[in-house]
A protein has these predicted regions:
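Processing junctions and N-termini across compartments
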Residues: 44, 48-51, 247, 275-278
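Flexible mid-to-C-terminal extensions adjoining Fe-S/redox cofactors in radical SAM and related proteins
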Residues: 264-319
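Conserved residues at the C-terminal ends of beta-strands
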Residues: 60, 91, 139, 201, ...
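Conserved alpha-helical substructure of the radical SAM core
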Residues: 8-128, 132, 311-314, 319
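Radical SAM enzyme [4Fe-4S]-AdoMet core and its adjacent flexible, acidic
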Residues: 1-5, 102-106, 115-118, 134, ...
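Local cysteine-cluster metal-coordination motifs and their immediate loop/turn environment
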Residues: 49-59, 255, 279-288
């Protein structure tokens, strides 16, 4: 019996084999005109274990599940690929702590590179930055005294590892809160020349009684400062439109473009907070959500930000 595929099914099958630029263009057409809701970017919390106890982070406090095996990790990565994911970010906890038998996070990255256009990793910077991911984010949340207050005396080691690394695509990611927001301009100036660029996000209140979340008035001051610094040539990677949109969250969130994997291997589709805390869209400060949503709306600046940060199509000889 001959089975005829619909135009939609044929398009979907062909997309699995496309190079990055054709895949993303076809992805856009499929989602816009066929009303598909296919995720594109996934964050994989490969472990909740961490060697630090950061003030703003709820994940290290959670009882770590049994370590997922390398075999399970490979199956999860394959599932993400089948779902349509083409950009992967490995997270924790501290992802460099993941280990199963002889396998380490380096092996996970090698497998992931065979499946995704771009593989990134977010780290606290206390381990050598020798991993061959396309992009490395190091969390830096203040100048030395402030960072150490938030991130348990890890500033010197993080900066040392950044400066020792030969990786060409290291970004600093700043989580902005009531402790550090007034020194963000000084931090940006300190980091300039040490990293490829700087991305930001605002602290999200996962816990009850949280006191670290900024008011929108404070947020606006920070964002205006970042816009001024970006105009002056400092390496703020987030787009102008993203920074402006975060002032009052006047952007249309496309959370269906996202997927999240928990340390136990379960997969959630949608908002980063889903299954991790109470979803409060009004106070969202995840600039990555903002940027990908703006890119879907065909804002060229946001599209170019994604291409620059994720280095689609780059080979490991480039790293």
């Amino acid at each position: 019996m001959t089975v005829r595929l619909s135009i939609h099914e044929t398009l979907q099958n062909e997309m699995m084999r496309l190079p990055w630029y054709l895949y993303l263009f076809t992805y856009y057409l499929k989602c816009r005109f066929f009303k598909e809701r296919t995720p594109l970017l996934a964050g994989f919390k490969i472990t909740s274990r961490c060697n630090l106890s950061c003030l703003h982070c709820p994940f290290w406090e959670r009882n770590p599940p049994k370590v997922i095996t390398f075999h399970q990790v490979k199956n999860i990565l394959s599932t993400l690929h089948e779902l349509g994911i083409r950009i992967l970010i490995l997270e924790g906890g501290e992802p460099f702590l993941w280990k199963e038998g002889k396998h380490t996070i380096h092996d996970v990255v090698e497998v992931a590179k065979s499946l995704f256009f771009s593989v990134g990793i977010t780290t606290n910077g206390t381990f050598p930055l020798t991993i061959k991911a396309h992009t490395i984010w190091v969390s830096i949340d203040g100048l030395k005294e402030t960072h150490n207050q938030i991130r348990e005396n890890s500033f010197d080691k993080a900066i040392e590892n950044i400066q020792k690394s030969s990786h060409p695509n290291i970004y600093a990611n700043i989580t902005i809160n009531r402790i550090n927001y007034q020194e963000i301009p000084a931090l940006v100036k300190f980091l300039t020349g040490k990293i490829k660029g700087i991305t930001i996000q605002f602290h999200y209140p996962y816990k009850k009684g949280d006191t670290l979340t900024l008011s929108f008035e404070q947020r606006k001051v920070v964002l205006d400062n970042l816009i001024t610094l970006k105009k002056a040539g400092y390496p703020i990677a987030d787009s102008y439109l993203c920074l402006e949109s975060l002032k009052d969250n006047s952007w249309d969130c496309q959370d269906w473009m996202l997927a999240n994997v928990e340390p136990d291997g379960s997969i959630n589709l949608g908002c980063y907070v889903k299954g991790r805390g109470k979803v409060q869209c009004k106070i969202c400060g995840f600039a990555a959500h903002t940027e990908i949503s703006l890119a879907y709306k065909w804002h060229i600046e946001s599209i170019l930000v994604g291409k620059k940060i994720f280095r689609y199509g780059s080979t490991m000889q480039d790293l």
